[in-house]
A protein has these predicted regions:
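Charged helix-capping and loop-helix junction motifs
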Residues: 103-107, 205-210, 284, 309-312
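Glycine-rich phosphate/nucleotide-binding loop
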Residues: 270-338
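Phosphate/diphosphate ligand-binding glycine-rich loop within oxidoreductases
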Residues: 56-177
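Positively charged, low-complexity intrinsically disordered leader regions
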Residues: 1-76, 80
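Glycine-rich phosphate/diphosphate-binding loop of Rossmann-like nucleotide-binding domains
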Residues: 68-80, 177-283, 287-290
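Peripheral docking tails and interdomain loops at the edges
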Residues: 154-194, 324-338
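Glycine/Thr-rich phosphate-binding loops of Rossmann-like dinucleotide-binding domains
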Residues: 128-130, 201-202, 276-277, 336-337
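A short helix->loop->beta-strand "cap" motif at the edges of active sites that frequently abuts
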Residues: 147-154, 220, 319-327
């Protein structure tokens, strides 16, 4: 059994100095040591809580949350994390703030950052907008700190944008590491990141993109499966390919769910919207073309309905040769093993 000193020794062996006074936008922005440091701290905090050791780091301070899209699990996870470390959470509701009266991002960012140690932002609805907003927000905060308006520069944590969902994907990755007994046991394991039918049409691409962008860094054989037309961002696919080449695993694509499931050690069913359609939706909203948006929604719902057979079923699972698989169901945030 590990001790707290074991985790401290592990952290001392890693180089993560650049994370200080920096932000967490995407996992592929971080080095291997930096990702391992995050996993190590997470394990250390769990050890401390389970052994009744205080995890309080701050005597006071704020954790600011800004959710520009609906959230349950991430909202409560962020609040729980802040509480665990000694921060009080303040949630900024843009509809109830001066933003609704035309206040700029620069003004808002600096105002809410007084006494803040961390800012968590979710902005995942529109392609090309979410990550850009997070960057603009933190550029304003950085400038405010340099100009002496803010005594300190809070850190941003991406709570999901249009490109990546790092907090969820890293939580899933750490669970997989635990399940297989360590990072060293992941090489050669097959994970199928598969599209699955949902009656709604507009789910973000950031989860499948986050999964292929992170899990290809661990020597795993990562398969991205979806019906024709449900592609993700090509630049994230390129990142996944480069990760696989560098780390000895593989990254492949298929339009056959059963093929993706075959011999998989882990399957990750998740619905998402087609990248091209989400780009079009963003343009329609920018133009104020609500008739066009309504038409697009009907087209996408009809397109989704053609793929109801893309479902994680007992029948599909029974066709596979392996007797054990790890299922990650993000719709319910449950981890099931069969």
């Amino acid at each position: 059994m590990k001790t707290l000193q074991d985790y401290i020794d592990k952290l001392n062996s890693l180089n993560f100095k650049e994370m200080y006074n920096n932000d967490f936008f995407w996992t592929w922005d971080k080095t291997d040591d930096e990702l391992e440091a995050v996993f190590t701290v997470a394990d250390a905090l769990r050890f401390m809580r389970e052994n009744n050791i205080s995890t309080k780091v701050f005597e006071s301070g704020l954790g600011i949350s800004i959710f520009r899209d609906n959230s349950t699990r991430t909202r409560f996870s962020f609040a729980s994390a802040c509480n665990l470390l000694g921060l009080e959470v303040q949630d900024l509701d843009e509809k109830k703030s001066q933003i609704a009266h035309g206040e700029t991002v620069r003004e808002t960012a600096n105002m809410v950052s007084f006494m803040a140690d961390v800012i968590g932002i979710r902005d995942d609805m529109y392609i090309g907008k979410g990550h850009a907003y997070q960057k603009e927000f933190m550029e304003a905060v950085t400038e405010g700190n340099k100009d002496g308006i803010l005594e300190q520069r809070p850190t941003l944590v991406n709570l999901q944008c249009d490109v990546d969902h790092p907090t969820q994907c890293m939580a899933d990755m750490l669970h997989i590491i635990h399940e297989f007994g360590g990072v060293e046991n992941l090489k050669g394991k097959k994970i199928a990141m598969t599209w699955a039918y949902s009656p709604s049409y507009g789910k973000p691409l950031s989860v499948p993109q986050g999964v292929i962008g992170l899990m290809t860094r661990f020597g795993m054989d990562v398969v991205l499966a979806h019906p024709e037309g449900y592609d993700v961002m090509p630049e994230v696919e390129e990142i996944a390919k480069k990760n696989a080449e560098k780390n000895g695993g593989s990254f492949t694509k298929t339009n056959d769910m059963a093929e993706a499931f075959k011999d998989a050690d882990i399957v990750y069913p998740k619905s998402w919207a087609p990248f091209a359609a989400m780009e079009k939706r963003t343009d329609l909203y920018a133009e104020g073309d609500f008739d066009g948006i309504d038409k697009l929604e009907k087209e996408l719902l009809a397109q989704n309905a053609q793929h109801k057979d893309w479902a994680c079923t007992e029948e599909l699972n029974e066709k596979q040769q392996k007797t054990e698989k790890l299922f990650t169901c993000t719709a319910c945030r449950l981890i099931l093993q069969v």
